[in-house]
Amino acid sequence: MYYVIASLLGYIFGCIHGSQIVGKLKGINIKDGGVKNAGASNTTILLGWKYGIVVALIDIFKATAAIFLLLILLQGNAIPTQEQHIYIYLTALFVIIGHNYPITMQFSGGKGTASLVGALIAIDWRIALIGIGVLILFTIATDYLAVGVLSMYISFLITTYYIFGLAPFFIVVGLSVLSIYKHIENYKRIIGKEETKLSSMFGKKAS
C-alpha cells in the first residue's frame, strides 16, 4: 500500500512544473526556445537568471514537500526504519519521473536537477550538503551544469550506500540512469563545444 502511496504522491508533486507556471505568467512556452527543455536552466537562458531562480525554487520545494508529506503519512504506523527509507527514496524517484514526464505537459518535461536537490534536502542533511557542494564545485570548475549534475549523482550514489544501504542505493542507480539519458544531448554539446556555459546564462538580464 505504501509503495503505491509513495509513487503516486511523488508523481503528482513532480507534475507541478516551475517552468510551466512561469511560462504561463510570461505568455511563452519554455520548451519552444533555448535548448527546448522545461527547466530552470532553459528558463534562465530565455528569461534571465531571476526567472530561472524562481523556477528552480518551485522545483526544489515540490520534491521536499512531497517527501515531508510522506513522512507525515507514515507517522504512527510502526513501519521499520529501513522500510521507511525505501518509501522516501521511491517518492524522490517518482517526483523526478513526474518532473521529467508530467501528464500535464504531454509527458515532456525537464531533467529533474532542481527536484533532486529538493529531494536531497528532505532525505538527509549530510547527503544534501555533500551533493549540493559537489554540484556547485564541479559546475563552477567546468562552467557546465551537466558536469556538476553528473557529479552530484555520483556523490548521491556513494552517500546513499554508506548511510542507508543497498535498497535505496539501487533506486538511486535508476535515478542516475534516467539523468544520464536526459542529459545525453548536453554531453554531446559539451564534446562539440556547443553547450551553453553557466557564466553566459547568468550574464543574461531578466526580461
Swiss-Prot record:
| Any Pfam family matching the protein | G3P_acyltransf
* Top-rank taxon: Bacteria
Q: Which reaction is the catalytic activity of this chain?
A: an acyl phosphate + sn-glycerol 3-phosphate = a 1-acyl-sn-glycero-3-phosphate + phosphate
Q: Which UniProt keywords apply?
A: Cell membrane, Lipid biosynthesis, Lipid metabolism, Membrane, Phospholipid biosynthesis, Phospholipid metabolism, Transferase, Transmembrane, Transmembrane helix
Assigned EC number:
2.3.1.275
Localization, per the record, is: Cell membrane
**TM annotation in the entry:** 3-23, 53-73, 85-105, 127-147, 154-174
Give me any GO biological process, just one. phospholipid biosynthetic process
Which GO molecular function annotation, any one, does this entry have?
A: acyl-phosphate glycerol-3-phosphate acyltransferase activity
Coiled-coil residue spans: none
Q: Which InterPro entries match?
A: G3P_acylTferase_PlsY (IPR003811)
An annotated GO cellular component of this protein is: plasma membrane
Predominant location = membrane
Q: How does it assemble?
A: Probably interacts with PlsX.
Family, as annotated: Belongs to the PlsY family.
Q: What does the record give as the function of this protein?
A: Catalyzes the transfer of an acyl group from acyl-phosphate (acyl-PO(4)) to glycerol-3-phosphate (G3P) to form lysophosphatidic acid (LPA). This enzyme utilizes acyl-phosphate as fatty acyl donor, but not acyl-CoA or acyl-ACP.
**Name recorded for this polypeptide:** Glycerol-3-phosphate acyltransferase 1
